[in-house]
Amino acid sequence: MITTLADIEKGLRRQEADRRLSRVRRKLLVMSGKGGVGKTTVCVNLAVAKARAGARVGILDVDFHGPDVAGALFLEARVEADGAGMLLPVPAGENLWVLTVQHLLEDPDEAVLWRGPRKMRAVERFVTEAAWPELDFLFVDSPPGTGDESLAAFRQVPGLEAILVTTGHSLSLADAAKAASFLRAARAPLAGVVDCMGTLVCPRCGEETALYPAGAAEAFAARSGAPLLARLPWDLEAQRLSEARGKPVVEAAPDSLLAGRLRELADRL
Ligand SMILES: Nc1ncnc2c1ncn2[C@@H]1O[C@H](COP(=O)(O)OP(=O)(O)O)[C@@H](O)[C@H]1O
Ligand SMILES: [Mg+2]
């Protein structure tokens, strides 16, 4: 086989990415079996909490069909490339950088129609052909399930661990079990489970009420051989403040039960 200049350049970019990634303290992919369980909310708020605490943090969004990181950060921007064609992650306030396909689209409502190989290649480009600054933490937001995007992320990011988000509902737990099985097959470590929206904070009195059978998420975590890292309440008021103030919950409603639990979770990482 003939080695081309392009092959050599690709190899050098790979080496540089591996060198850069080896210095990142923790690389965490937020995943789930089911959709709509709170992945993007967890991912973005953990990243913001860490960045506000002084760490240098990157968010890589590999959810190409539902890229919500930009929306969850209330960050409109366009990704630029430098002279060498390297993508420049978008700054999102002090210590935080974001790379998402949403910031590459001409029309914000445009659908990304990529299939398997195109998505695998895009993840590779976001990792090896992007000028990421030196980071302490990298959070990867993923689509639900066990598809190409998450697999590509584990291939492209050495040392990547998973945080598995689920609700306490039986269907969410059943799909989470498949995600855990995927991780075992991919030999990817599971850092822990997050139970999201398993309790409800009463908007009137602030009392926290369980929505699902007690211990369901905890038992799932134990079966998966990973710790239950957090129980995040369904907090409608914190969510409302986030929307109204145009900031993630940890910034928009720092005194809420949800923000407190998210900060505790960030501290455990
Ligand atoms: N703990 C929570 N309290 C209130 N709303 C939440 C909470 N977690 C997620 N949400 C809301 O639920 C919806 C789905 O969450 P999202 O993070 O987008 O899930 P996913 O990324 O898994 O699809 C969003 O509208 C989000 O704002
Ligand atoms: Mg999402």
Regions found by a protein language model. Name each.
Residues 140-183:
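Conserved P-loop NTPase nucleotide-binding/switch module
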Residues 24, 35, 61, 69, ...:
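Residue-level signature of catalytic and energy-coupling elements of molecular machines
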Residues 105-158:
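Phosphate-binding/switch loop-helix module in NTP-utilizing enzymes
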Residues 26-64, 176, 180-182:
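Walker A/P-loop phosphate-binding motif and the immediately C-terminal alpha-helix
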Residues 1-12, 180-269:
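C-terminal lobe/tail of nucleotide-utilizing enzymes
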Residues 56-61, 164, 192-193:
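Short beta-strand "acidic-cap" motif of Rossmann-like dinucleotide-binding folds
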Residues 1-37, 78:
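Extreme N-terminal, non-catalytic leader segments
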Residues 56-58, 62-105, 120, 124-127:
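Phosphate-binding loop that captures ATP/GTP phosphates
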